[in-house]
Structure formats: structure tokens, C-alpha cells
């Protein structure tokens, strides 16, 4: 049963010869019930602006539009543009298609006025983590978006929501924990995709904090990169490239500890000590 009167996705993909490309990190979702479930995680979308990255043939796009959203979809794969144009014609004035690379997109310029958009996407696996890092480190803060509802490989999702002293805790968990509140909403099995990935996927819902701890985003990015770049080493070793001895002395943090034991607050303290040293 179609959610919108448009042809089934399998038919669309066959008609436009849209076999997923591994080089673009593509894994298409065919089940419109599942894409509708993802869209619902973003909240009430009626008349709300939404940014979608990597729509492919438009399965999630259709679910977002069916729930009343105004969607701006950014697609790098030109093969998908005709299929997306058919959806655009079905929802006049509700879908804006941008052909290009999301990593080069100025997202804050897409919605200069009106309510902040929500980002809802089944992100291409090969750029998903980098896009999230860009959105977490964006300036100014609060950011250009009001929330993010994103699909990742399960392992990446666990890194986003990880806490200190856990196996998945790392740079991504620190940056996400600093500026946002995040949770894993639900898992999606490999067989839901074409082609099926080798791992479980998860949908993560992320809400920006209005007032995160004061800290320079670039400094925190550099500190976490150094600390977790050699995560099994003591901080006095891993932080050497960023003046670790002085940072540890200023903050009173024990240099024999390892990065995965530090709280977000302790990383913020290191970053704030790092700025005057630079």
C-alpha cells in the first residue's frame, strides 16, 4: 500500500535504473512503513522545514512530505534527480531539490528566515560521521537546526550516545555530549536495505543544548582528536602535540589517566586551558 499514491519504490528504482552505488555509500530503504517510522521520530512535521541529505530514490522524502513537511533534499547522485523530480511534481511547492555534495553545502544559508529546520536523513555511510561532526562543531551556537533524526551504522550510533568508561566512548561521544542530548530511537535490520549492509543500523535523535558549557569548538575538536588518536596511551603522552603537560597542570587532571575515563566537563576544561596556550 502506497502512503501517497505514487508508485512503489521498487518500480521507481527499476524504471530509473537506480542500483545503489557502493562508492557513494548508498543503501536504499524500500519499506515506506519504515521510512514513515523514521519521519515520526522527528516529531510533528506539519508545515515544518526539513533538510534531508542523500534522499536517493526518495523513500524517506515521500514519508516526510506525507507527514506535511517542506523538504529540502540534497542529492549528489545525478541519477536520482529524475525520480525526485516526480515526487516534486506530486507535492507542488513542498520539495526543493539541490544537486550537490552535502559536505560542501552551506546549510545555514538554506533557511535564512522562519523556523529552524530539522535534519532527517538516512545518511550515506561513507560521509555520515563527517557530516555529523560538521553539524556538532558549527558556529554560531545554538545551530541552524532544531533537531536531527539520523540513520547510522549501529556502531556509530553507539559512539554518539556513549558515556565515559564505556567501550564506544570517544571523540564523537564527547562532542555530541557537550552540545546535544542524544538517544538511539530504534534499530533497523540489514534486510530492510538494498543492498543489505553487513551490520545493524540505528536511528538516532539528537537535540541541541541551548546553553552548552562555554568552550571553543575548534579547541575542543583538537583536544579530543589528540586524546583519542592514541586512546590507549596515558594523557601525558597522547596530549603532547597540544602542550599536554601544561594543560594537565592547569586543569589538575591526572596525566596517567586515559582519554576514555574523562568526562565531557573535563575535556571542556582542557580545551579552555588550551586556548590561551595556542
From Swiss-Prot:
It is an enzyme of class 2 (transferase). Keywords: Cytoplasm, Methyltransferase, RNA-binding, rRNA processing, S-adenosyl-L-methionine, Transferase. Its main location: cytoplasm. InterPro entries: KsgA/Erm, rRNA_Ade_diMease-like_C, rRNA_Ade_Mease_Trfase_CS, rRNA_Ade_methylase_Trfase_N, rRNA_adenine_dimethylase, SAM-dependent_MTases_sf. PANTHER family: DIMETHYLADENOSINE TRANSFERASE, DIMETHYLADENOSINE TRANSFERASE-RELATED. It comes from the Bacteria. Specifically dimethylates two adjacent adenosines (A1518 and A1519) in the loop of a conserved hairpin near the 3'-end of 16S rRNA in the 30S particle. May play a critical role in biogenesis of 30S subunits. This is Ribosomal RNA small subunit methyltransferase A. S-adenosyl-L-methionine binds at residues 27, 29, 54, 75, 101, 122. Its EC number is 2.1.1.182. NCBIfam families: ksgA. Belongs to the class I-like SAM-binding methyltransferase superfamily. rRNA adenine N(6)-methyltransferase family. RsmA subfamily. It catalyses: adenosine(1518)/adenosine(1519) in 16S rRNA + 4 S-adenosyl-L-methionine = N(6)-dimethyladenosine(1518)/N(6)-dimethyladenosine(1519) in 16S rRNA + 4 S-adenosyl-L-homocysteine + 4 H(+). One of its GO terms (molecular function) is 16S rRNA (adenine(1518)-N(6)/adenine(1519)-N(6))-dimethyltransferase activity. Pfam families: RrnaAD. One of its GO terms (cellular component) is cytosol. The keyword Kinase does not apply. It is found in: Cytoplasm.
Amino acid at each position: 500500500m502506497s502512503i501517497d499514491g505514487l508508485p512503489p519504490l521498487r518500480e521507481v528504482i527499476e524504471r530509473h535504473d537506480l542500483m545503489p552505488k557502493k562508492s557513494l555509500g548508498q543503501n536504499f530503504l524500500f519499506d515506506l512503513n519504515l521510512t514513515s517510522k523514521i519521519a515520526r521520530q522527528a516529531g510533528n512535521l506539519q508545515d515544518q522545514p526539513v533538510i534531508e541529505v542523500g534522499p536517493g530514490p526518495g523513500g524517506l522524502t515521500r514519508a516526510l512530505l506525507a507527514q506535511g513537511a517542506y523538504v529540502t533534499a540534497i542529492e549528489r547522485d545525478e541519477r536520482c534527480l529524475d525520480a525526485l523530480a516526480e515526487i516534486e511534481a506530486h507535492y507542488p511547492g513542498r520539495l526543493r531539490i539541490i544537486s550537490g555534495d552535502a559536505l560542501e553545502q552551506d546549510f545555514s544559508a538554506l533557511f535564512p528566515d522562519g523556523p529552524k529546520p530539522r535534519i532527517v536523513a538516512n545518511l550515506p555511510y561513507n560521509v555520515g560521521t563527517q557530516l555529523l561532526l560538521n553539524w556538532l562543531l558549527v558556529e554560531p551556537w545554538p545551530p541552524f537546526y532544531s533537531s536531527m533524526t539520523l540513520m547510522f551504522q549501529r556502531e556509530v550510533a553507539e559512539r554518539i550516545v556513549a558515556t565515559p568508561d564505556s567501550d564506544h566512548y570517544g571523540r564523537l561521544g564527547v562532542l555530541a555530549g557537550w552540545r546535544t542530548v542524544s538517544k538511539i530511537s530504534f534499530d533497523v535490520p540489514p534486510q530492510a536495505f538494498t543492498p543489505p549492509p553487513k551490520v545493524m543500523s540505528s536511528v538516532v535523535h539528537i537535540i541541541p543544548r541551548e546553553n552548552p558549557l562555554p568552550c571553543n569548538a575548534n579547541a575542543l575538536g583538537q583536544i579530543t582528536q589528540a586524546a583519542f588518536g592514541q586512546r590507549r596511551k596515558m594523557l601525558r603522552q597522547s596530549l603532547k602535540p597540544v602542550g599536554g603537560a601544561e594543560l594537565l597542570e592547569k586543569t589538575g587532571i591526572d596525566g596517567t589517566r586515559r582519554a576514555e575515563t574523562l568526562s565531557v566537563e573535563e575535556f571542556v576544561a582542557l580545551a579552555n586551558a588550551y586556548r590561551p596556550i595556542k
